[in-house]
């Protein structure tokens, strides 16, 4: 690359997408700066999203496990922990992650600049620094990886101390007894699990007719039943008319005429890209109504020297995919093309209690496509390992072509689902006839393990053939 600019490339944002791009660029010898608006690297994933919510979930699930373990069932008092204590656990994990990621940049001599970036022209950024000064930076190319934030409708007062979004909920300073969660997407369902696991009353307001409609319907139904069985009140096909903050909580008026009151509200209905402060109009770029940018297969925007990755380009909005997008964009930026691409079947992990994970097609999709598939199932309660550790709730379902035996989709509900799914994913990615359900029958698994569910499910499915 010519060295007429301050940098070969500037990456805006240090979340998974920005990190993947920055590391990919410096490994190829590029002079790179990463701009981060906050004091610490890691982006929303590390500080407000994936890491803290999963740390909260882990702490709560351990409390549930203790309270339900028959070894301790004769104790007269249940184990409890305050929300503040659980948040402390999340903070410890965040600090570890931040130090580790800061080390990545330092070891690779990648410069970190703090401040808010905005485009001045096609190759120039103005950096508004924390001390009020403004620096001018130039680069031949750019990667926009500035992530997303919770969507804030204008008629909801997020300055009220009892109205939270998925970022501010991590700063809650009171102990809720009853929480309203508006939005039953992934974030809403995960926090419904967390709060209910802490014995907090939960009303989950779903604007659609079922939970997580993109999932295989059996997985969605399993989650709905588990929520119902644990005491979560789910209200489908509802939208708010008005949200009132009051001294002792929040009142929500629904368009159906219902009124709900709780100690606090978590508004978790949508996200928007952090692009509004970038002055993209100065380089001829436009976003959609959600602040997202359109890109091609190499993650180039309408300006060929400007790339975008992660939440700021929308689907799949996963930290795992964002890192790979950044790595691919780095290859394309330096070499003009990339020899890697995102896999077609990206696994989905949803960290409710229990977890849900899936990869490939659902039964509903295969039926609509008129694919002759069969189903193999394994119930966790029949696995020795699950009985030993007390994880009896759950199932693994394998969908496979009844003629070729090719695995078409895998869906798992239960503890460790997000880990278990990768065994099947590895086989699904095999080429030249390697993707076959018969692999699980012909393979010897460690015993007792949760992975054995694949053998049980494979035998169950193959026994259905005639």
UniProtKB/Swiss-Prot annotation:
Compartments it resides in: Cytoplasm
EC code(s) of this entry: 1.6.1.1
Keywords on record: Cytoplasm, FAD, Flavoprotein, NAD, NADP, Oxidoreductase
Main location: cytoplasm
Cofactor note: Binds 1 FAD per subunit.
Family that this chain belongs to: Belongs to the class-I pyridine nucleotide-disulfide oxidoreductase family.
Name of the protein this chain belongs to: Soluble pyridine nucleotide transhydrogenase
Source species: Escherichia coli O81 (strain ED1a)
Annotated gene: sthA
